[in-house]
Amino acid sequence: MLTFPLINDTSRKIIHIDMDAFFASVEVRDNPSLKGKPVVIARNPLQTGGRGVVSTCSYEARAFGIHSAMSAKEAYDLCPQAIFISGNYEKYTKVSKQVREIFKRYTDNIEAASIDEAYLDVTENKIGAQSAIKIAKLIQHDIFVELGLTCSAGVSYNKFLAKIASDYEKPHGLTLIMPDEALEFLAKLPVEKFHGVGKATVPKLHALGFFTGGDLQKADPVDLAEKFGIYGWELFQKANGIHNSKVKNHRERKSVGKERTYGKLLYLPDDIKAELIKISKQVSESLKRHQLKGNIIILKLRYSDFTTLTKRKSMVENLDSPEDIAEAAQQIFEEIDYDESLGVRLLGVTVSGFGVQKATLDMQ
């Protein structure tokens, strides 16, 4: 019989900082006339023949139902008065570095999750504060006063809960989840709010009767693992407030990937799938060279307007063969809302999740 040890480290003090509508907020800051207006970071569909994808948008735009990864045309249809801005990634990167410098006043134990969010372990910190809430408030204050931007903060004893907390109250929110509050907090949370649960997984969980964290808390972890592989076990742990992944200041290499840029744009889905086969073969060769297998496949697609889509898929088995990787990458491609009119200038396939094989063995 499989055994699942439940080891929960509640001694850490973790903060997750998520910049509020980051790209749009930077544009509003730099152009105050945009304040209070629906701002969409995407090329204007009236100037591109309806092409383009939304990177992000202001909260005023979100009130109309606009969201990231939506087509610019659909965003325009929802809100014709929206102000479309192509965006300036170089500027956003510069501001992101300024935010990180503020983090460094309090701790060097910082893990950047993306350009607009990061985890901070402040268990030991530079100002000798016992309260992580105090540090989170200071960071919010510094970012607002010095950079003219707001962020939401989540505080808890692990990264998963800190991320959940930062999403709980936006914008400019601050939420604390204490160890003795975690189970009750998670029990009420819909499974789609669990970080890492993708759109494809939600209906599968619903079909099995799992709608909330409380449902997962009452589940048989062995049954979840049989249905979802190691991911099912991780879901059970998260629903019970357990996530012992440490904040990593310098991330070790945990993935193998290859990208191709095309001088001649790709339009036809069949052409894109054919290229994914070629790229998957290169990834497979690299994996085998390093004697690695992974259960997470990531597809990266960049349109001609430089809008980039990234989508991942968790597999039950560890993969390293070109056929399996290509099949998974093609499945992901079929799941995205591909805009054939834009043309693709870059494709990438990445495999990660190398620790899964060991974790599976540990449960036997």
From Swiss-Prot:
Principal EC category: transferase
Matching Gene3D superfamilies: 3.30.70.270, 3.40.1170.60, 5' to 3' exonuclease, C-terminal subdomain, DNA polymerase, Y-family, little finger domain
Record-listed Mg(2+) binding positions: D18, D116
Cofactor note: Binds 2 magnesium ions per subunit.
One annotated GO biological process: DNA-templated DNA replication
Site, as annotated: Substrate discrimination: F23
Subunit structure as annotated in this protein's UniProt entry: Monomer.
Top-rank lineage group of the source organism: Bacteria
Transmembrane regions: none
GO terms under cellular component: cytosol
Pfam families xref list: IMS, IMS_C, IMS_HHH
Function: Poorly processive, error-prone DNA polymerase involved in untargeted mutagenesis. Copies undamaged DNA at stalled replication forks, which arise in vivo from mismatched or misaligned primer ends. These misaligned primers can be extended by PolIV. Exhibits no 3'-5' exonuclease (proofreading) activity. May be involved in translesional synthesis, in conjunction with the beta clamp from PolIII.
Residues the record marks as active site: E117
Keywords: Cytoplasm, DNA damage, DNA repair, DNA replication, DNA-binding, DNA-directed DNA polymerase, Magnesium, Metal-binding, Mutator protein, Nucleotidyltransferase, Transferase
Span of domain UmuC: 14-198
Annotated catalysed reactions: DNA(n) + a 2'-deoxyribonucleoside 5'-triphosphate = DNA(n+1) + diphosphate
Name of the protein in its database record: DNA polymerase IV
Xref: NCBIfam families: PRK02406.1 (NF002677)
HAMAP family documented for this protein: DNApol_IV (MF_01113)
Entry's family note: Belongs to the DNA polymerase type-Y family.
Residues in the signal sequence: none
Lineage: Bacteria, Bacillati, Bacillota, Bacilli, Lactobacillales
GO MF assignments: damaged DNA binding; DNA-directed DNA polymerase activity; magnesium ion binding
Listed EC numbers: 2.7.7.7
Subcellular location: Cytoplasm
